[in-house]
């Protein structure tokens, strides 16, 4: 059995944020709503607003890739739990982002196969030629590729659809995909109601 990958979610700052924050009237923060991280208590209590002396505006995102795009567009100043893979990918491409802390370390991602297909780790090659939902450039994507390699599944034969976890869970439920790779509590619960982990 392949071990689940432990993923680190980073707290990242957009370039210039450290110097611009002092003059800003507000700070825009990205976060994952379905991850029960402690910052959400402080968000409700306005603790960050009080500590920073500015209005903190929170925006929920489905993936760390979306957070990165919003930061690069100048719409987001801080990403809370952006995800290791999106952060590293952005840095490798020269993005002016800086990791300031680790938000949470979590047990990463499952790939759920639709119930009724009869596909398990024992006959995973039957996934070849099928459509799967994967949130690309995330730890779920990394885990998917490692699992397929371990199960000797030829990914070049698969149609890989880039979907956020919540959308992937819906596609799994309606039969649009044979497998969906998921992170996040609510999405994993939804996928688990209509499918089972391949490993």
Residue ranges and their predicted role:
Residues 1-9:
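Bacterial N-terminal signal peptides that target proteins for export
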Residues 168-191:
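Loop-centered beta-sheet repeat module
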């Amino acid at each position: 059995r392949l071990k689940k990958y432990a993923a680190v979610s980073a707290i990242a700052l957009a370039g210039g944020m450290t110097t611009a924050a002092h003059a800003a009237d507000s700070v825009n923060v990205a976060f994952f709503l379905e991850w029960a991280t402690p910052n959400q208590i402080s968000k409700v209590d306005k603790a960050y607003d009080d500590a920073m002396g500015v209005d903190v505006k929170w925006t929920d995102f489905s993936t760390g890739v979306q957070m990165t795009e919003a930061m690069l567009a100048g719409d987001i100043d801080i990403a809370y739990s952006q995800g290791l893979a999106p952060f590293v990918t952005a840095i490798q491409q020269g993005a002016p982002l800086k990791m300031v802390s680790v938000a949470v370390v979590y047990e990463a991602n499952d790939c759920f196969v639709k119930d009724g297909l009869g596909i398990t780790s024992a006959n995973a090659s039957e996934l070849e030629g099928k459509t799967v939902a994967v949130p690309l450039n995330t730890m779920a994507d990394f885990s998917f590729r490692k699992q397929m390699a371990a199960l000797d599944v030829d990914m070049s034969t698969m149609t890989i659809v880039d979907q956020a976890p919540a959308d992937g869970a819906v596609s799994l439920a309606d039969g649009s995909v044979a497998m969906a790779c998921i992170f996040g509590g609510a999405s994993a619960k939804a996928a688990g109601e209509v499918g089972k982990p391949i490993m």
